[in-house]
């Protein structure tokens, strides 16, 4: 079969998504390739499909045990022989996999980078024809990447040990230009076919909220999404426990996941979410990156992550099946303190040198600064993300929380002059910059001991804004940060003037900010456009999928995604020929599951 026939036969798609065919053709022509595609953009097909067509075996290097398991289960569900090699396997299981590798029973083998240098794996590989090495999450090989893993450097040594250099295929969803160049250099990609399909996920709605009480806001969001499946990310284990308890007390089918739980409980909770027994997963970032669940309708961040790379990767768990999905971040200033704590205490990897730790810490603070700016910006959120990753974009996307709000301009030149002048005079008086609280206290004319001891009551801007509340002054400072007049140096939490501030202080330039004409609570829900009858049929098909999933020991989305069930609902096939035309079905799955689904479809047609 040719590539298009294989795409239909095994994966159920009649055509390639953007970028896929170019990468597949490159691999089949013996070229190295580098695919930069968003989460849910179909990266796995780019190496799985040519892996079926190449004469030898494809090795896929992946950093995540749970992702390997899910990917191999999905391969088997599609009728493709695959296996994985990682630390989750017992010695007898590992020995059985090695034996089957030598017998040529697998076309695609997932392997953890740590296993590439193990004697048993190397002995098996020496006797195999390796046609391709695919590197998933390729940004992990670069120290400039947000998930740098020294174990990924072993990939290069492993490839050199092979008797013949295979095709090298690298893939990532989140990488700046600097990281991309580093990946190509380290992996020694030779004149690669490089495809950047863009980082945009048009089906995702982005929104940042600044609630006074996060619990109440979270409950309101979930109340509007009762029928939907989603993830609530928290920054700490303690927050996970508290939020999960809150949701279960309110009757939500919620479960939890964090590194503090026993592995058995983590797996039970993960499977309950994957099998749709629980609809809400409350988790730290230990969950999600390796989960291939396609029918996640929303991702809510209860706390701000420490980088846009992390945020976009976690938010990208939503809408993988192409359906509309919501990505909502609940921001509070204390989230910055939590992120700083993780940065200061996060570089405990024993494989890193002290110099590497310092480089990573500096980069982490730069990323945190970008993340905070995203949370505060009033410009297009999608545009902000795309610009960060170096992609051009329209000024307004029309599909995010910022674009849905109506703003008007307000002149705050007088207030800006007071604040900027105060920051400058404190620096001149003390010889160094101070934090935001000290600036606010000075402007309010505080008589606190520290203010007096520093002599800040003697500068001309002391008490200049004494009629304003501390919160009002803080909000103005935030607006000046948004406008680029001030910047918070996050490592030491000092408020500093930028070059742009000089125009206001010395040249009489005015300052205008955008304010909401009317504060409104946005509530974007996924409008699937289904009629009442279609919704009823869709639910029956979901029940059929759940029954088959339990019977076959696989997650429901591995049988068919929500997008496939939706297409099935709308096309309403009543015979096998029509059933195979449903997007995402394919020959193999039609032969295994077709009769069961057609029974439901025919029953609904009566």
Label every model-predicted segment.
Residues 1-3, 337-338, 349-353, 363-365, ...:
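Accessory DNA-binding and partner-docking regions appended to nucleic-acid-acting proteins
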Residues 1-10, 14-18, 22-44, 51-54, ...:
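Helicase motor core with emphasis on the C-terminal RecA-like subdomain
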Residues 15, 163, 291, 377, ...:
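Helix-turn-helix/winged-helix DNA-binding modules
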Residues 27, 222, 273, 375, ...:
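Short helix-to-turn junction characteristic of helix-turn-helix DNA-binding domains
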Residues 46-47, 59-60:
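Hydrophobic alpha-helical transmembrane segments of integral membrane proteins
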Residues 359-389:
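Short, charged low-complexity linear segments at domain edges
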């Amino acid at each position: 079969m040719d590539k298009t026939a294989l795409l239909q036969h095994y994966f159920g798609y009649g055509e390639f998504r953007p970028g896929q065919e170019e990468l597949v053709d490159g691999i089949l022509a013996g070229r190295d390739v580098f695919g930069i595609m968003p989460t849910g953009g179909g990266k796995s097909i780019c190496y799985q499909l040519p892996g079926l067509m190449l004469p030898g075996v494809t090795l896929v290097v992946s950093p995540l045990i749970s992702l390997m398991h899910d990917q191999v289960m999905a391969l088997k569900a599609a009728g493709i022989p695959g296996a994985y090699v990682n630390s989750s396997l017992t010695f007898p299981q590992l020995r059985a996999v090695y034996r089957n590798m030598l017998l040529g029973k697998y076309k695609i083998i997932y392997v953890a980078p740590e296993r590439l240098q193990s004697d048993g794996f190397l002995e098996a590989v020496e006797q195999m024809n390796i046609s391709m090495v695919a590197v998933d999450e390729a940004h992990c090989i670069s120290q400039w990447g947000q998930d740098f893993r020294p174990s990924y450097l072993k990939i290069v040594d492993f490839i050199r040990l092979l008797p013949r250099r295979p095709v090298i295929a690298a893939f990532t969803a989140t990488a700046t230009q600097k990281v991309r160049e580093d990946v190509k250099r380290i992996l020694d990609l030779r004149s690669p076919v490089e495809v950047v399909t863009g980082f945009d996920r048009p089906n995702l709605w982005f929104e940042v909220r600044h609630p006074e009480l996060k619990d109440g806001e979270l409950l309101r969001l979930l109340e509007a999404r009762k029928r939907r499946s989603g993830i609530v990310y928290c920054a700490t284990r303690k927050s996970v426990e508290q939020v999960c308890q809150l949701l279960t007390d309110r009757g939500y089918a919620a479960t939890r996941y964090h590194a503090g739980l026993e592995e058995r409980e983590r797996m039970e909770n993960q499977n309950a979410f994957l099998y749709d027994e629980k609809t809400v997963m409350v988790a730290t970032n230990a969950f999600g990156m390796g989960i291939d669940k396609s029918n996640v309708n929303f991702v809510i961040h209860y706390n701000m992550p420490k980088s846009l790379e992390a945020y976009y990767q976690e938010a990208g768990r939503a809408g993988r099946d192409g359906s509309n999905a919501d990505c909502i971040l609940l921001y509070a200033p204390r989230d910055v303190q939590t992120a700083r704590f993780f940065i200061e205490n996060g570089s405990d990897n024993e494989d890193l040198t002290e110099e590497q730790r310092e480089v990573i810490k500096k980069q982490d603070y730069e990323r945190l600064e970008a993340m905070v700016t995203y949370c505060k910006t009033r410009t297009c959120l999608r545009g902000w993300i795309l610009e960060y990753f170096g992609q051009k974009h329209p000024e307004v996307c029309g599909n995010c929380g910022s674009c849905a709000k109506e703003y008007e301009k307000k002149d705050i030149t007088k207030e800006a002059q007071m604040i900027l002048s105060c920051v400058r005079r404190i620096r001149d008086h003390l010889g160094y910059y101070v934090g935001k609280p000290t600036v606010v206290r000075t402007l309010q004319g505080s008589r606190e001991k520290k203010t007096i001891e520093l002599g800040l009551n003697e500068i001309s801007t002391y008490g200049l804004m004494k009629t304003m509340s501390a919160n009002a002054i803080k909000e103005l400072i935030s607006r000046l940060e948004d406008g680029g007049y001030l910047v918070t140096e996050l490592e030491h939490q000092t408020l500093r003037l930028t070059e742009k501030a000089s125009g206001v202080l010395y040249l009489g330039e005015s300052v205008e900010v955008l304010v909401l004409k009317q504060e409104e609570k946005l509530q974007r829900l996924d409008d699937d456009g289904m009629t009442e009858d279609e919704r009823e049929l869709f639910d029956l098909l979901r029940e059929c999928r759940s029954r088959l999933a339990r019977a076959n020991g696989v997650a429901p989305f591995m049988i068919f995604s929500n997008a496939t069930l939706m297409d099935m609902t709308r096309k309403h096939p009543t015979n096998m020929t029509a059933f195979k035309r449903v997007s995402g079905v394919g020959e193999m799955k039609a032969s295994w599951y077709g009769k069961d689904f057609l029974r439901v479809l025919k029953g609904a047609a009566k």
